[in-house]
């Protein structure tokens, strides 16, 4: 919570029924000796310390147990954007998860147990506008330029257009070196179509020929814009329409597969899911119509399609045919990469892309307004700014839905295979064993009414109890206790976990707290993709792994 408050989270509420004790002094930085001496509720001490870190953050505390709140006033959790629960056992976590899902509230479960840390996000539906992929190429639309972009490229032409490279024939060397590579490629596309019966390049062989033609334009060998054009030549490649297609557009559009999955999600067909329609899905529905048109079938496409045979430089995408009035393209974001050019030419080109982005966003907003009217909602309930933001990041849209904790605990053949694979992989063996043993710890707690290993005189019995609980869990998945693990490995890990007792080590908690803060921001802001599954941190071997069941 310290990292969240320092980051300006806005408002926090701490729920805890305990009173500050001497044990907290070694485990919780927010508790000091004066808090212990005065018998202050631990939640009050934590809030006092947290709010002192950032004056812009407000906070409150509730002195109560989770069990009491769940039993008497579960609606308490409905007010929150995110519930972060720490140190809960399996049954407690499942009960809280069920309540949060019922209210559509995101939950994050964090647990530190000795040298092991566990983190699990649980969301019924998490809509991500800015997934921020590691590599997102600029959307320049060179294979299918719009009229204003073509006109911009045409403005560089010198001569009567009779010769193949007449654009550059009368340019001096300095002017030639500063022609933006976008213009070079657009003219190269025009020349290609002129000599290939109007067909656009669509194969790897075409790409190699294009690059050779571009390199042939070098004069002194130091033209950086030519090198940039060669590096971006793959952007001219277009999917080749199939022969069975009922229509043959000059350039089929492409939509990233992750985004296509969002556009084709049942929730994008407003009202089909039976749940309250959020602004996100209304705008996605408008984007779907913008791309595919209002005549798209259940898959978001009309008959026809194509494939693209290109080298690895090309972005992995799926083809989408036109339907109705669909543009077959996502709204352009309007951004430009750096390139060799004069300042005047670059700014003029930027204006062309900015104007196109604004035009696309306006078109989507008009669809949104129409849909709002059809739903009987005020068209001011979704602002043009919100639509523009989603259009700008249209290529980064994703939707995440996690299995509930209850579903995760239910054995299936698929989960059995995943556990076997994780245990056999040397990089994930230890984390998987710790994951299973922490579940076994909670089962052992039910019979012992304490954590295994809390009392030295009961250590051997606790090890046996914990091992039996772990074997029972493996048996539920139809797995032999030995599997393909080295002899005695499960016993060794059971002894290690029992050795922890109920210890909560500060160093492990600190690392896990940092990860939890990062995941919390992902869930609150709708940026980046949260961890899908249970993340296990093994501080013994300094390893981490995600167990997705």
Locations of regions flagged by a protein language model:
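Adenine nucleotide-associated cytosolic modules
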Residues: 1-549
């Amino acid at each position: 919570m310290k990292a969240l408050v320092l980051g300006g989270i806005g408002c926090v509420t701490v729920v805890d029924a305990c009173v500050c004790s001497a044990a907290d002094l070694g485990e919780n930085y927010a508790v000091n000796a004066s808090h212990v001496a005065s018998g202050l509720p631990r939640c009050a001490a934590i809030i006092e310390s947290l709010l002192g870190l950032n004056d812009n953050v407000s906070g409150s505390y509730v002195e109560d147990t989770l069990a009491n709140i769940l039993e008497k006033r579960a609606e308490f959790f409905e007010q929150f954007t995110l519930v972060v629960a720490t140190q809960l056992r399996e049954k407690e976590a499942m009960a809280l998860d069920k309540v949060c899902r019922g209210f559509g509230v995101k939950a994050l479960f964090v647990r530190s147990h000795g040298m092991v840390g566990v983190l699990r996000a649980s969301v019924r539906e998490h809509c991500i506008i800015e997934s921020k992929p590691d590599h997102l190429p600029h959307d320049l639309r060179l294979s299918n330029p719009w009229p204003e972009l073509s006109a911009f490229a045409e403005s560089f032409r010198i001569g009567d257009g009779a010769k193949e490279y007449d654009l550059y024939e009368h340019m001096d060397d300095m002017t030639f070196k500063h022609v933006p590579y976008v213009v070079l490629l657009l003219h190269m596309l025009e020349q290609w179509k002129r000599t290939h019966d109007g067909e656009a390049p669509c194969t790897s062989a075409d790409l190699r020929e294009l690059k050779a033609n571009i390199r042939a334009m070098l004069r002194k060998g130091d033209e950086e814009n030519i090198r940039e054009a060669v590096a971006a030549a793959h952007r001219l490649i277009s999917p080749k329409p199939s022969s069975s297609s009922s229509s043959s557009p000059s350039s089929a559009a492409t939509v990233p597969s992750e985004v296509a999955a969002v556009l084709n999600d049942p929730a994008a067909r407003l009202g089909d899911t039976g749940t309250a329609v959020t602004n996100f899905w209304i705008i996605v529905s408008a984007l779907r119509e913008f791309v595919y048109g209002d005549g798209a079938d259940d898959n978001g496409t009309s008959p026809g399609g194509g494939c693209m045979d290109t080298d690895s430089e090309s972005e992995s995408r799926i083809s989408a045919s036109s339907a109705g009035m669909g543009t077959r393209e996502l709204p352009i974001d309007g951004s430009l990469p750096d390139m060799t050019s004069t300042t005047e030419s670059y700014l003029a080109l930027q204006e062309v892309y900015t104007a196109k982005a604004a035009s696309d966003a306006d078109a989507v907003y008009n669809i949104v307004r129409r849909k709002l009217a059809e739903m009987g909602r005020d068209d001011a309930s979704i602002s043009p700014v919100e639509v523009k933001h989603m259009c700008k990041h249209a290529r980064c849209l994703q939707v995440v839905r996690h299995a509930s904790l209850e579903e995760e605990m239910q054995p299936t053949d698929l989960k059995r295979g995943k556990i076997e694979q994780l245990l056999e992989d040397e990089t994930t063996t230890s984390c998987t064993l710790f994951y299973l043993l922490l579940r076994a710890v909670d089962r052992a707690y039910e019979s012992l009414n304490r954590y295994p290993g809390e009392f030295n005189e009961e250590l051997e019995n606790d090890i046996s109890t914990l091992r039996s609980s772990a074997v029972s869990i493996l048996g539920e998945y139809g797995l032999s206790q030995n599997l393909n693990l080295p002899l005695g490995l499960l016993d060794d890990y059971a002894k290690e976990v029992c050795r922890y007792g109920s210890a909560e080590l500060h160093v492990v908690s600190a690392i896990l707290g940092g990860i939890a803060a990062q995941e919390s921001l992902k869930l609150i802001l709708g940026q980046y993709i949260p961890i899908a599954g249970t993340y296990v941190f093994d501080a013994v071997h300094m390893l981490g792994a995600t167990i997705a069941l």
